[in-house]
Amino acid sequence: MNENIAEKFRADGVARPNWSAVFAVAFCVACLITVEFLPVSLLTPMAQDLGISEGVAGQSVTVTAFVAMFSSLFITQIIQATDRRYIVILFAVLLTASCLMVSFANSFTLLLLGRACLGLALGGFWAISASLTMRLVPARTVPKALSVIFGAVSIALVIAAPLGSFLGGIIGWRNVFNAAAVMGVLCVIWVVKSLPSLPGEPSHQKQNMFSLLQRPGVMAGMIAIFMSFAGQFAFFTYIRPVYMNLAGFDVDGLTLVLLSFGIASFVGTSFSSYVLKRSVKLALAGAPLLLALSALTLIVWGSDKTVAAAIAIIWGLAFALVPVGWSTWITRSLADQAEKAGSIQVAVIQLANTCGAAVGGYALDNFGLLSPLALSGGLMLLTALVVAAKVRITPMS
């Protein structure tokens, strides 16, 4: 029955791709991600200006992720049948307002309020991004459209911190956020001009969000999503101490490694649609298996700089398949409830990121330098096994 509903949902899709709207969504995503991580490179001047410690200033990133998790869970219940075009415009306005509130913040409270606004937009936008994409392009083009959106994410992750640091030294941290607000205005204009009307789901399609987990293979999919992202953050959060102490990279060398990782991630995302067209399940099982082998290689031969640098590139290429692949899984296997599935997915990812980083840090402090790698590799291997054995992928119609 669920398959029949999904097939009908896909059959009602668009006949021709609306690439202008897809790129508008991608631009909004890139701006959201960039602003999310701007404080990472601006903590010191922000803390000094507001008279707080850098640790306290760092909570401006934490509160964004925390609010985003709850926003992703409840946004579809709140917006219900509202035209998604207006919702995306609202998120772009919230992005702009957040930047301005942070720019003019004269207290830590106002700073957190501004960052909470960003969390609302970030979580809500991610929750509906997959369903938006599948309504802007034909079913066969969805992986390509998703690769465009996640390619924008990769670019934002590469440039956010260095760009913020560079501009902050020239124009000051407040003007960096003013510049980001201008980007938010551009988001609003582009979305208004390019995004068509996208009515909310009809009442007969409404279903309790968590009842989706009772569908065959869905709970297994969410567990696999959790393990893959927890595995990523268990290692990547601590890549600096691992690479500097295990492989002996200095700061400049580590910068090049991270840049290589970012470029590889962008390349992997750009070509992910070609892999996913052949087999979504193979990509979702093969990528974490390759990452598990990469973690094992680092544990055994990571003291060699060449090996360590090569693994960073392989890791960036392989993990790039993971977010695009799971979003494609939602558009294929949960097409009739893509928004609610996206809400659960985003919340699971946010929780996984937090747990992965926390457990990885505990392991590093208590079990040694290689323990985050072992934890990450183990989680990636389990992910591959769960996907191969339990996750179902609906064939493309």
From Swiss-Prot:
Residue spans, topological domain Cytoplasmic: 1-21, 76-85, 129-147, 197-215, 277-281, 327-343, 388-397
GO molecular function, one term: antiporter activity
Catalytic activity: inosine(in) + H(+)(out) = inosine(out) + H(+)(in); guanosine(in) + H(+)(out) = guanosine(out) + H(+)(in)
Disulfide cross-links: none
InterPro entries assigned to the protein according to its UniProt record, in alphabetical order: MFS (IPR011701), MFS_dom (IPR020846), MFS_Efflux_Transporters (IPR050189), MFS_NepI (IPR023680), MFS_trans_sf (IPR036259)
Membrane spanning residue stretches: 22-42, 55-75, 86-106, 108-128, 148-168, 176-196, 216-236, 256-276, 282-302, 306-326, 344-364, 367-387
Pfam annotation, one family: MFS_1
SUPFAM superfamilies: MFS general substrate transporter (SSF103473)
Name of the featured protein: Purine ribonucleoside efflux pump NepI
Organism: Salmonella paratyphi A (strain AKU_12601)
